């Protein structure tokens, strides 16, 4: 099948950010009274928004998840990203090739907040290749695992979702792409930041690399 567009997740696919974000979240949760390990934190939150686990956070910390708390988390997270973020090895070259082959019909469809996505793409030099086709689940009624962000990206490119390829590294993201009707390719280079090939295939990924 020849695809007319490719839709990329951002964190863990284009940029190596998951461990940085997880470290900041772990620090915040520990300071709030939840004695969770970094490994447990990653397992619970990878591929999800923090607010999607509001009930659990409030139960474990005994305090409300306020806008001020989220702002402090974002500040700590962004400080780490500005200092340490790098592109996934080979991602920049791959995106450049896809952009050339598809006449620019590529997009980012992320579950993260758009400010974070824009900052990360800019830092690793990918922003000009994707702009303005950068989409966040935070800006839509539902985020991943619902398909909204992928449907929005496909619509903006003028391509039917069934003619799109999606690249994802989490079960949540693969599920979103599959429900959107796209063909999903899983990325699983190993390590705790990425789902296993078996998990990605079980969620509906056609191939895993």
Model-predicted regions and their roles:
Residues 14, 87, 106, 166-167:
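Conserved SAM-binding loop
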Residues 87, 109, 142:
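Residue-level marker of regulatory loop/turn positions in helix-turn-helix DNA-binding domains and
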